[in-house]
């Protein structure tokens, strides 16, 4: 005979056998009792005793079986992105569309805690039920993503910026999945820092392989990358809220004191920044443009 947990995390037809106060009593396929709160009925009409209806089955925190007609986005057999509600020492708690949150245990998350998802991130998960009849969220494996991603076999996405979320983090690189279903790999040489699991990032497509998987980069195009002097100026602009009282006619002494570079190096650097529309140069000052600020947001 099947165990109770076989129906947990799945959609089943259950018979209504009674009503106690505001709670319906349902009969499971193995004779188990399942409770249904009236708030979890999606029709205004009352359910009829003796009739069968379709429900999603889940356990409360005590392991009691409950049902809902508000079908979740994720079941035992279905993967989707779930919103992270919060993280604590036990792991990350996600919203899968049920009256209660579901936990991704800490041991399933990255070993480096700074790479854990944060509140508002979305992680690719399914449901799993343990031997104690408790329900958890399970991160998608590479095998699962292989079955569900949308392949791209030409260069139509070349240099396109795509928003995606990491579902797997390795030292060699980051594996991401976009809303459109594109699978993207970013080698560690194509990033300055490792993104969090589930964090929304913008990745530039730089190629594809014969399996339809895309290769991406978090780095700007080569001609947009800043040299050392340009980076010094850019970082100071960010630190001082986007504006500095220097321009190409500032004194060499003042430039040396603040930027630790010659006036010639300073002029070349701000010329490069201006050419690529990262800064504006006005009388007596330089300031970040909207494009310049976007580089800060992309970090």
From Swiss-Prot:
Superkingdom: Bacteria
One Pfam family of this chain: CvfB_2nd
InterPro entries: CvfB_fam (IPR014464), CvfB_S1_2nd (IPR048588), CvfB_S1_3rd (IPR048587), CvfB_S1_st (IPR039566), CvfB_WH (IPR040764), NA-bd_OB-fold (IPR012340), WH-like_DNA-bd_sf (IPR036388)
Record family assignment: Belongs to the CvfB family.
Matching PANTHER family: CONSERVED VIRULENCE FACTOR B
Protein's name in the database: Conserved virulence factor B
Species whose genome carries this gene: Staphylococcus haemolyticus (strain JCSC1435)
Lineage: Bacteria, Bacillati, Bacillota, Bacilli, Bacillales
């Amino acid at each position: 005979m099947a165990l109770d947990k076989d129906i947990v995390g799945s959609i089943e037809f259950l018979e209504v056998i009674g009503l106690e106060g505001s709670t319906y009593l349902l009969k499971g396929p193995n004779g188990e009792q399942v409770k249904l709160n009236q708030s979890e009925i999606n029709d205004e009409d009352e359910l009829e005793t003796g009739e069968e209806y379709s429900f999603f089955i889940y356990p409360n925190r005590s392991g009691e079986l409950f049902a809902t007609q508000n079908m979740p986005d994720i079941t035992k057999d279905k993967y989707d992105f779930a919103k992270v509600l919060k993280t604590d020492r036990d792991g990350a708690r996600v919203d899968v569309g049920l009256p209660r949150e579901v936990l991704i245990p800490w041991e399933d998350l990255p070993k480096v805690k700074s790479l854990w998802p944060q509140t508002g991130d979305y992680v690719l998960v399914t449901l799993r039920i343990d031997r104690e009849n408790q329900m958890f969220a399970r991160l998608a494996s590479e095998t699962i993503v292989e079955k569900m991603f949308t392949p791209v076999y030409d260069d139509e996405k070349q240099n396109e910026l795509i928003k995606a979320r990491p579902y797997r983090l390795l030292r060699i690189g980051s594996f991401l999945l976009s809303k459109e279903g594109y699978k993207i790999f970013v080698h560690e040489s194509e990033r300055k820092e490792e993104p969090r699991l589930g964090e929304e990032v913008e990745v530039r497509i730089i190629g594809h392989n014969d399996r339809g998987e895309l290769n991406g980069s978090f780095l700007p195009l080569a001609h947009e990358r800043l040299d050392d002097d340009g980076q010094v100026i850019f970082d100071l602009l960010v630190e001082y809220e986007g504006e500095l009282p220097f321009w190409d006619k500032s004194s060499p002494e003042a430039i040396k004191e603040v930027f630790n570079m010659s006036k010639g190096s300073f002029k070349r650097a701000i010329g490069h920044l201006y050419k690529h529309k990262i800064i504006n140069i006005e009388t007596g000052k330089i300031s970040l443009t909207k494009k310049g600020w976007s580089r800060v947001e992309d970090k």
